[in-house]
Amino acid sequence: MKITAARVIITCPGRNFVTLKIETDQGVYGIGDATLNGRELSVVAYLQEHVAPCLIGMDPRRIEDIWQYVYRGAYWRRGPVTMRAIAAVDMALWDIKAKMAGMPLYQLLGGRSRDGIMVYGHANGSDIAETVEAVGHYIDMGYKAIRAQTGVPGIKDAYGVGRGKLYYEPADASLPSVTGWDTRKALNYVPKLFEELRKTYGFDHHLLHDGHHRYTPQEAANLGKMLEPYQLFWLEDCTPAENQEAFRLVRQHTVTPLAVGEIFNTIWDAKDLIQNQLIDYIRATVVGAGGLTHLRRIADLASLYQVRTGCHGATDLSPVTMGCALHFDTWVPNFGIQEYMRHTEETDAVFPHDYWFEKGELFVGETPGHGVDIDEELAAKYPYKPAYLPVARLEDGTMWNW
């Protein structure tokens, strides 16, 4: 069995997605996601110029060997562009292997560890009252876990506050938009949101919050401490993870569970945080961390230290990544939760899939492979559109972490 083609497909049914389709001499094909939000064409170039030509003639069943080839063979390893290209190849190969075996991907990974996948949705509003109402909307839809983000008085375009009730897409056309940030204002306001949420809905639902790398270690510890009475499922990305020792300070001052890792690319990014038990959830993704082959290694390491998975699942990941993540979630023993932001109807049409939502959980189907395909004819009707993620500045104009 040989790979005969590896084609890159770019489409924008509401936002940009990069898809790799690997074809074989036996007529079986697989698809993988290579989307890097706001930097999509960098991965396209890497795939087309440096990866796809090398795959022709290889045996697609040799998943591990091909993973090592595209990782070690490049010499310039790691990084978001390289690892997303590797992830796309890896997803497509697992898709092919599961199709050849005639079984859904989770069976090939080791079978079910659970029936349904608990997911969390994104509720947001321009102020506390609007966010409380939005959380109620998600509860009415059956969600058991909801991330809550609110606009903060005096902060321009606070993170996580979208233009609609169900869809949040921060990437803008043209050049990056400028948002604001003021830690003092956020620390004074965010705890009030969760106080009101618990007062309104009680403690029967899981609540989550994303700091999005905005806080210093001391500020993050302060926020975690203030949120303790409201029993959050987790506080995500409370401080930039490049400074991993910072999580030791946060850990020493709060028992609010900590989650990090959506921007991690390899096990080396997560190793110290996991082994030192400085986090509770690892949020590395199938597309960001080099595919299922490498994400399994991260999860296996995490399981030794009682760290659970909580894969990133925003709309910057295509349904291909979501499908792979759900098969991974169905298998992985140390599963925690799965982020789930609904895609647009146009995106769902371009990427037909067999997973579905019911009563706060996602379920995978029994289709051989990862259960997600791409309608190339429809995809061609949505050409690429340049879009950048925003940037953030403090009130005095200083650049900050978006």
Swiss-Prot record:
A GO biological process held by the record: amino acid catabolic process
Cofactor(s) annotated in UniProt: Mg(2+)
GO function terms (MF aspect): magnesium ion binding; mannonate dehydratase activity
Binding locations of Mg(2+): D210, E236, E262
Keyword hit for Isomerase: no
Result after altering R147K: Decreases catalytic activity
Residues forming the catalytic site: Y159, H212
Pathway: Carbohydrate metabolism; pentose and glucuronate interconversion
Family assignment from sequence similarity: Belongs to the mandelate racemase/muconate lactonizing enzyme family. GalD subfamily.
PANTHER family xrefs: D-GALACTONATE DEHYDRATASE-RELATED, STARVATION-SENSING PROTEIN RSPA
Subunit and partners: Homotetramer.
Listed name of the protein: D-mannonate dehydratase
Organism: Novosphingobium aromaticivorans (strain ATCC 700278 / DSM 12444 / CCUG 56034 / CIP 105152 / NBRC 16084 / F199)
Lineage: Bacteria, Pseudomonadati, Pseudomonadota, Alphaproteobacteria, Sphingomonadales
